Amino acid sequence: MKGGRRGQVPVKQNQHRLNGEIRGVREVRLTGADGESVGIVSIQEALATAEESGLDLVEISPNAEPPVCRVMDYGKFLFEKSKATKEQKKKQKQIQIKELKFRPGTDVGDYQVKLRNLIRFLEEGNKVKVTIRFRGREMAHQDIGVDVLNRLKEDTDEFAVVESFPTKIEARQMIMVLAPKKK
């Protein structure tokens, strides 16, 4: 069979050396299970201390001179670490940019529906890109498009801050970006 390990997930290596894996050193700076510094001891003494307490000897800082080791429950340490990273991921929120398209002749009912959606997007914490599209002869009435944008700006004043307001028309459209107000 050709190939090799196709489709298999690579095995993740431990970031820390444990117990018998700590080789090539005679002395280590030992930290006890409760966090207090024991001092510089031989590797055998450190392993014996870890074994007596029923915990693991974990090499925390291998590049230090002498290497720093700590007596701890390694499984619990990894669990706490993964729990902390999950908490950080929960706190991060991806900001999306939602887009709403209007026309210069957008009717009052349609305007109200789109305004409701725009306010909902802002309350969810998303930015909103408002586009006014011009077709055919509507290009002659760009002032109506600016009026629609100004009306939107006034209607969303308590929810949003205008990030960018169009100064000129580009590719038959005007674009305004609204960002949610900080609470």
From Swiss-Prot:
The record's GO CC annotations read: cytosol
A molecular-function term among this protein's GO annotations? ribosome binding
User: Which key words are in the record?
Assistant: Cytoplasm, Initiation factor, Protein biosynthesis
What subcellular compartments does it reside in?
Cytoplasm
Question: Which ranges of the sequence are coiled-coil?
Answer: none
Family listed: Belongs to the IF-3 family.
The free-text function statement in the UniProt record for this protein reads:
IF-3 binds to the 30S ribosomal subunit and shifts the equilibrium between 70S ribosomes and their 50S and 30S subunits in favor of the free subunits, thus enhancing the availability of 30S subunits on which protein synthesis initiation begins.
Q: Which NCBIfam families match?
A: infC (TIGR00168)
Q: Assembly and interactions?
A: Monomer.
Designated name of the protein = Translation initiation factor IF-3
Identify the species of origin.
Vibrio cholerae serotype O1 (strain ATCC 39315 / El Tor Inaba N16961)
- Gene encoding this polypeptide? infC
